[in-house]
Amino acid sequence: DFNIGLKGSITLGEGRNWSVSKNSGFAYTGRVELFPLGRFKSLGDITEGDFEREERVKILLAGAYSFNDNTNRLQGQKGDIMPNNETRDINSYFVDFILKYNGFAFYTDFMGRKCSDPLFTGDNETSIYNGNGLNIQTSYLFPKNWEIALRNSTMFPEEKVQQMVG
């Protein structure tokens, strides 16, 4: 039942609906997905609850990394344009864990973003978020399709940008 999923992409580093500029870079992204007990039913790895009521325990452990070269957006492929037409390299990483069984679902996502120079000279209100985040969610789907869920999301900004992002 063990299964592996591999995904990769090379895209424009500025996201959708972007025209080429002299500073444009690319974003290089890769993802590895491990399904040690087999794949989920009906793409259950992309829905939050266990709507398929998995009859056997199913687990996903995944990791992804993205390098956005010379982007001019504050969030890489999204967000506002950086001040003064500046560009930065942004590294992002993600680790996901999903477990589902008979209506019970547990998700956790750990993610982070790193930029070597997240602040802008002469602009005390704009920064690139440097730090980590953690999402945890657990839920139970009752047989009549009523669901209860508990979720917590927390951000851990690096000290350099903490005063700007709260």
How should these model regions be labeled?
Residues N23, E33-P36, K41-E159:
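Detector for outer-membrane/organellar transmembrane beta-barrel domains
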